[in-house]
Amino acid sequence: MSKVYVFDHPLIQHKLTYIRDKHTGTKEFRELVEEVATLMAFEITRDLPLQEVDIETPVSKAKAKVIAGKKLGIIPILRAGIGMVDGILKLIPAAKVGHIGLYRDPETLKPVEYYVKLPTDVEERDFIVVDPMLATGGSAVEAIHALKKRGAKNIKFMCLIAAPEGVEAVQQAHPDVDIYIAALDEKLNDHGYIVPGLGDAGDRLFGTK
């Protein structure tokens, strides 16, 4: 079974409070989401492998460490996931960015791919799938499936707020994918919104309704 990591860092929790607040405007909301994504990226990359290299400082030769292993790819789930990408790229500027778009089938109510654009070297990368919300888990499950069937092996899922139902859905469908969240909320309401949540992340990011 995959692991669930809840980041309780004071800066993350402080900024998340204002992200939740319904009085926070679009500009500030967008900036806060980006900032929290940066802080979460710092934590999620804590286990990246290192290798020793030889360098020369202005004073002497030295042994130093650089990141080793596979390169990273960031995959936002459209459209709200886009709001987290720049924050991650501030720490990992060389990461490649793909996109996965999903729509809900009106009859089955299940997510269906409508757009998938990934780096050409999928099998050579480790991926972080990002979406501000993990509600029912349907979109996350399908996005991860889309990556796997195209050759991705090592995938992590990162979101700001999750409901227990969404976490369970991802764990059952993808027990090899660890989940990283800023807050685990109480439940989903009858309309599928996370409670207390933050509302519709996409609308709040882009100023739409």
From Swiss-Prot:
A Gene Ontology molecular function term for this protein is: magnesium ion binding
Q: How is its activity regulated?
A: Allosterically activated by GTP.
What is the required cofactor set for this protein? Mg(2+)
Where along the chain is uracil bound?
Answer: 194, 199-201
Q: Does the keyword Nucleotide-binding apply?
A: yes
Xref: InterPro entries = PRibTrfase_dom, PRTase-like, Upp_B, UPRTase/APRTase, Ura_phspho_trans
Task: Write down the superkingdom of origin.
Answer: Bacteria
- Entry keyword annotation includes Magnesium: yes
- List of residues binding 5-phospho-alpha-D-ribose 1-diphosphate: 79, 104, 131-139, 200
**Keywords from the named record:** Allosteric enzyme, Glycosyltransferase, GTP-binding, Magnesium, Nucleotide-binding, Transferase
Name one matching Pfam family.
UPRTase
Alphabetical GO biological process terms: UMP salvage; uracil salvage
Similarity comment text for this entry = Belongs to the UPRTase family.
What is the name attached to this protein's record? Uracil phosphoribosyltransferase
According to its UniProt entry, this protein's organism is: Anoxybacillus flavithermus (strain DSM 21510 / WK1)
